[in-house]
């Protein structure tokens, strides 16, 4: 029986319970205690990458905006690791679910907007009406800016969902083509398999890039409101 193309996007369960519970609990059991942590090259590289990412994201922030550094680095590590784990065979990618991405995007966006209205109410309201706008265009621009503000979290979530889903579907289709061509034309199957390997490497890059883009946009929303 042929497998449904979207089967990989269905939350896997075991005995009626979501397997994601095991995914969350099992790594926590293996997490090393502070006395087991050691300084080695891998940890040094990880610290260097974290510092580099934070430096790039916090360049535009003032001292108040830099208090969000821990949240931003936690967000990019969570999304990046989730995207990479989704590339492992027989696993599930939570970021292909629009509901999860909206669950991340809406609270982060709402927190940034509420922070802006609490600390910079006049500046936040000024975004709805650019300076020098003709009087006749004021009502229309206010409506347009309001709509664009509320579209931001949806665009943030849909961008991540679409990019991750498209890559997984393409890998699924090419992988099926490799299996179908194996018995028909080994040469064509070999070429298609090479394309699949290149696409897999590209998906690793996309997984990290999309995590960076998502977090960078959240950082920009915070910058506009702090």
Swiss-Prot record:
<dbReference type="GO" id="GO:0015252">
    <property type="term" value="F:proton channel activity"/>
</dbReference>
<dbReference type="GO" id="GO:1902600">
    <property type="term" value="P:proton transmembrane transport"/>
</dbReference>
<dbReference type="InterPro" id="IPR045083">
    <property type="entry name" value="ATP_synth_F0_asu_bact/mt"/>
</dbReference>
<keyword id="KW-0406">Ion transport</keyword>
<feature type="transmembrane region" description="Helical">
    <location>
        <begin position="9"/>
        <end position="29"/>
    </location>
</feature>
<feature type="transmembrane region" description="Helical">
    <location>
        <begin position="68"/>
        <end position="88"/>
    </location>
</feature>
<dbReference type="GO" id="GO:0046933">
    <property type="term" value="F:proton-transporting ATP synthase activity, rotational mechanism"/>
</dbReference>
<keyword id="KW-0138">CF(0)</keyword>
<comment type="subunit">
    <text>Component of the ATP synthase complex composed at least of ATP5F1A/subunit alpha, ATP5F1B/subunit beta, ATP5MC1/subunit c (homooctomer), MT-ATP6/subunit a, MT-ATP8/subunit 8, ATP5ME/subunit e, ATP5MF/subunit f, ATP5MG/subunit g, ATP5MK/subunit k, ATP5MJ/subunit j, ATP5F1C/subunit gamma, ATP5F1D/subunit delta, ATP5F1E/subunit epsilon, ATP5PF/subunit F6, ATP5PB/subunit b, ATP5PD/subunit d, ATP5PO/subunit OSCP.</text>
</comment>
<keyword id="KW-0066">ATP synthesis</keyword>
<feature type="transmembrane region" description="Helical">
    <location>
        <begin position="97"/>
        <end position="117"/>
    </location>
</feature>
<feature type="transmembrane region" description="Helical">
    <location>
        <begin position="138"/>
        <end position="158"/>
    </location>
</feature>
<keyword id="KW-0999">Mitochondrion inner membrane</keyword>
<keyword id="KW-0813">Transport</keyword>
<keyword id="KW-0375">Hydrogen ion transport</keyword>
<feature type="transmembrane region" description="Helical">
    <location>
        <begin position="164"/>
        <end position="184"/>
    </location>
</feature>
<dbReference type="InterPro" id="IPR023011">
    <property type="entry name" value="ATP_synth_F0_asu_AS"/>
</dbReference>
<dbReference type="InterPro" id="IPR035908">
    <property type="entry name" value="F0_ATP_A_sf"/>
</dbReference>
<keyword id="KW-0812">Transmembrane</keyword>
<dbReference type="Pfam" id="PF00119">
    <property type="entry name" value="ATP-synt_A"/>
</dbReference>
<keyword id="KW-0472">Membrane</keyword>
<dbReference type="GO" id="GO:0015986">
    <property type="term" value="P:proton motive force-driven ATP synthesis"/>
</dbReference>
<dbReference type="GO" id="GO:0005743">
    <property type="term" value="C:mitochondrial inner membrane"/>
</dbReference>
<keyword id="KW-1133">Transmembrane helix</keyword>
<comment type="similarity">
    <text>Belongs to the ATPase A chain family.</text>
</comment>
<comment type="function">
    <text>Subunit a, of the mitochondrial membrane ATP synthase complex (F(1)F(0) ATP synthase or Complex V) that produces ATP from ADP in the presence of a proton gradient across the membrane which is generated by electron transport complexes of the respiratory chain. ATP synthase complex consist of a soluble F(1) head domain - the catalytic core - and a membrane F(1) domain - the membrane proton channel. These two domains are linked by a central stalk rotating inside the F(1) region and a stationary peripheral stalk.</text>
</comment>
<dbReference type="GO" id="GO:0045259">
    <property type="term" value="C:proton-transporting ATP synthase complex"/>
</dbReference>
<protein>
    <recommendedName>
        <fullName>ATP synthase F(0) complex subunit a</fullName>
    </recommendedName>
</protein>
<dbReference type="InterPro" id="IPR000568">
    <property type="entry name" value="ATP_synth_F0_asu"/>
</dbReference>
<keyword id="KW-0496">Mitochondrion</keyword>
<feature type="transmembrane region" description="Helical">
    <location>
        <begin position="201"/>
        <end position="223"/>
    </location>
</feature>
């Amino acid at each position: 029986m042929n497998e449904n193309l979207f089967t990989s996007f269905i939350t896997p369960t075991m005995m009626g319970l979501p397997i994601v519970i095991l995914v969350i609990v099992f790594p926590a059991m293996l997490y090393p205690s502070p006395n087991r942590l050691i300084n080695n090259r891998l940890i040094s590289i990880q610290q260097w990458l974290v510092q580099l990412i934070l430096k790039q994201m916090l360049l535009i922030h003032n001292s108040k905006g830099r208090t969000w550094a821990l949240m931003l680095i936690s967000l990019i590590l969570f999304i990046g690791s989730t995207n990479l784990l989704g590339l492992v065979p027989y696993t599930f990618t939570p970021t292909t679910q629009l509901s999860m991405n909206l669950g991340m995007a809406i609270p982060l966006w709402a927190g940034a907007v509420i922070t802006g209205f609490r600390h910079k109410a006049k500046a936040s309201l000024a975004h709805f009406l650019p300076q020098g706008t003709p009087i006749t265009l004021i009502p229309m621009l206010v409506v347009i800016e309001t709509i664009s503000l509320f579209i931001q979290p949806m665009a943030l979530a849909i961008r991540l969902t679409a990019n991750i889903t498209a890559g997984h579907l393409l890998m699924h289709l090419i992988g099926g083509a490799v299996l179908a061509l194996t018995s028909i034309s080994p040469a064509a199957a070999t070429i298609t398999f090479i394309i699949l390997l290149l696409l897999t490497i590209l998906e690793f890059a996309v997984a990290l890039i999309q995590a960076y883009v998502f977090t960078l946009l959240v950082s920009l929303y915070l910058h506009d409101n702090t």
